[in-house]
Amino acid sequence: MTTALLPTGFRDRLPPFADAAARLEAAALAAAYAYGYERADPALAEFEAGLAGRLKAARAQDAVRFVDPVSQATLAIRPDMTAQIGRIAATRMGHHPRPVRLSYAGPVLKLRASQLAPEREL
């Protein structure tokens, strides 16, 4: 009997694919920087109530939720980074001149996969 090492929808990224993906991400971020975009790295997880309020209903259902052992509050792992970037631009960077130009890249996690998009870790 074979035991799967990773949950459905997850995969290890091995050489040379991990290297190629890193180069592509770096090139995209460098191009954005050349056009005046600053890099932002939002947290992987945040309070579920705040994140769900900024996500569209369908995306909010994709969030993986868990209870934070420190605060005992429900946290959510982002299924999409765009809402977090909006939060950062509106709150933490509220003093910046408008428009705020931010670039971002990083992993997201979906609760469920679909037939057209079987990956859960993107």
Task: Give the label of every model feature segment.
Residues 1-122:
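TRNA-recognition modules of translation machinery and tRNA-sensing kinases, especially anticodon-binding
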